[in-house]
Amino acid sequence: MSAIVDIFAREILDSRGNPTVECDVLLESGVMGRAAVPSGASTGQKEALELRDGDKSRYSGKGVLKAVEHVNNQIAQALIGIDANEQSYIDQIMIELDGTENKGNLGANATLAVSMAVARAAAEDSGLPLYRYLGGAGPMSLPVPMMNVINGGEHANNSLNIQEFMIMPVGAKSFREALRCGAEIFHALKKLCDSKGFPTTVGDEGGFAPNLNSHKEALQLMVEATEAAGYKAGEDVLFALDCASSEFYKDGKYHLEAEGRSYTNAEFAEYLEGLVNEFPIISIEDGMDENDWEGWKLLTEKLGGKVQLVGDDLFVTNPKILAEGIEKGVANALLVKVNQIGTLSETLKAVDLAKRNRYASVMSHRSGETEDSTIADLAVATNCMQIKTGSLSRSDRMAKYNQLLRIEEELAEAADYPSKAAFYQLGK
């Protein structure tokens, strides 16, 4: 009864008004699974290919009708009749059908839409929530959220080079309490920005995007907002950064235009260490350019024992590249973005590899999102213990947070909120 009888994709719009792929998978039992694919703004060079039409007369070339056609034709023909519970087998068929290292023929936006929709259909057919279908019957942790309250870089039109300034409510006793903490700080930050004459418009991920003179000024604003909301920075709340350093790395140097400075990798590692020493920063993502392995090694040696160093553009959720990073001893955490690799099975392999080597995993959204909340279930299913899914505004971000509230409610006493234990790889 769980055989696939129909697969149908369509072009929908994401949170930036750009086209993306949504897929429906219908099973013999009559149940349907639906999934929509996100899209990034700052992307790693080694990410799986997001197939765009290139037809400038439609959506400035960003249409996805080719990817939709691939789903409705080649992929559907290859998968109809197969049991939806055979997730790995289904994903492998698509990988072989594509025949490239980076999903360059079918498009990762085509394969991922199908992969996630198959999992949703199979979960529905089994009478299980997605997180239980993928994660089994064991104990589960709700993730500590990384909440992006100040946006810079490619996510905002302002003076900040560092892309994301985030808060992590580690003092909370539950996810519900953590979400409340984040929301209260977010609203306190809005009042603070208002009082200082900063605009309170938001960036792609729902955070504020004020024009500030330095990154320290952004962090100081976060300290003030945390205290104004009645919490203690460094105790109740820790900070996290996504530098997205590849976006300002040029000719072997890191150029912070807002501060009028350029740094070698050793100097930039010292710059980040200075921020860590001055502010309660527990996590830094993409602190070096994705190809600057020497810089990553320096940063890991300098900060890896006390700060989570997350590889996003560095690892692109690719098990092969992650294995290379583990062997070289760079970073200590993996950012997990399903569309960087293009199938659910490969995503789960990357998380498993990270865990086996004591690297933390952070489940993540993209800056171009939809109402799809699959990553919320994935964060719980994989026991990632951390999730990064934007600020406390924009319904595309709230969809994930609200799904986590529902999951915590369903799990009841079985739900664990890990707090600082989410950073289990530190101090090893």
Curated annotation (Swiss-Prot):
Its EC number is 4.2.1.11. InterPro entries: Enolase, Enolase-like_C_sf, Enolase-like_N, Enolase_C, Enolase_CS, Enolase_N. This is Enolase. It is an enzyme of class 4 (lyase). HAMAP family: Enolase. Catalyzes the reversible conversion of 2-phosphoglycerate (2-PG) into phosphoenolpyruvate (PEP). It is essential for the degradation of carbohydrates via glycolysis. (2R)-2-phosphoglycerate binds at residues 163, 337, 366-367, 388. GO terms for molecular function: magnesium ion binding; phosphopyruvate hydratase activity. GO terms for cellular component: cell surface; extracellular region; phosphopyruvate hydratase complex. Disulfide bonds: none annotated. It comes from Neisseria meningitidis serogroup A / serotype 4A (strain DSM 15465 / Z2491). It is found in: Cytoplasm; Secreted; Cell surface. One of its GO terms (biological process) is glycolytic process. It catalyses: (2R)-2-phosphoglycerate = phosphoenolpyruvate + H2O. Binds a second Mg(2+) ion via substrate during catalysis. Its cofactor is Mg(2+). The lineage of its organism: Bacteria, Pseudomonadati, Pseudomonadota, Betaproteobacteria, Neisseriales. Its main location: cytoplasm. Belongs to the enolase family. The active site is at 205 (proton donor), 337 (proton acceptor). Mg(2+) binds at residues 242, 285, 312. Pathway: Carbohydrate degradation; glycolysis; pyruvate from D-glyceraldehyde 3-phosphate: step 4/5. Pfam families: Enolase_C, Enolase_N. Keywords: Cytoplasm, Glycolysis, Lyase, Magnesium, Metal-binding, Secreted.
